[in-house]
Swiss-Prot record:
This is DNA-directed RNA polymerase 7 kDa subunit. Its main location: virion. One of its GO terms (cellular component) is virion component. The gene is RPO7. Induction: Expressed in the early phase of the viral replicative cycle. Its EC number is 2.7.7.6. GO terms for biological process: DNA-templated transcription.
Amino acid sequence: MVFALVCASCGRDLSEVRYRLLIERQKLSDVLRNLTHMCCRLKLATQIEPYRNLTVQPLLDIN
């Protein structure tokens, strides 16, 4: 299960950006150049490592 990547500041869906990083294997610096909103660029630069942490696995309910 993959959750949508959403900017917490502006609410923009960043799933297309995640697709470019993961599937098209573009560099993070190249992808950041195409983003116009500074808050989205900051989120990607600080919370995503390329090819890692791009999918979020849901926690298992142990109850």
